[in-house]
Amino acid sequence: MNASSEDVKDMLVAVSALGLTFATNLFIGKEEKTPRNCVTIFDTAGYAPDLGLTNQGYERPSIQIRVRNTKYVTGWNLIESIKTSLHGRAQETWNDTLYTVIYCSSGPAHLDWDDNGNARFIINFNLQRRAA
């Protein structure tokens, strides 16, 4: 299985209302300097793989999504829309990986203002998945 961030990236791009395009305003692992309005997905420490389901390779990773925007309210609205798009998704296959559930574990929350005066928000998700 690939990194969870790769699959979540595809999920977010598929929601056209979010207006996200990979490598344009949606990134993985590194928040680019431009554009100022963007979304970045980070793979973060999750839970240990389920030992009771070792034959299925059942994993429980987590991700953090960070939204940066020049306007506080616009950034907040986008991270709320991302939460709505991902929270509660279940029994979906993406890139040969079955996601049995995705749920918001914390956030959204205002993280800080970056050095350029952009508002940054974060949200965390736990995922449960196995090879399809």
Residue ranges and their predicted role:
Residues G57-K71, I82, A119-R129:
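Oligomerization/assembly interface segments of phage tail-like spikes and tubes
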Residues P49, V73-G75, A131:
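Residue-level signal for secondary-structure boundary sites
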Residues H87-A132:
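Acidic-leaning, charged glycine-interspersed low-complexity segments
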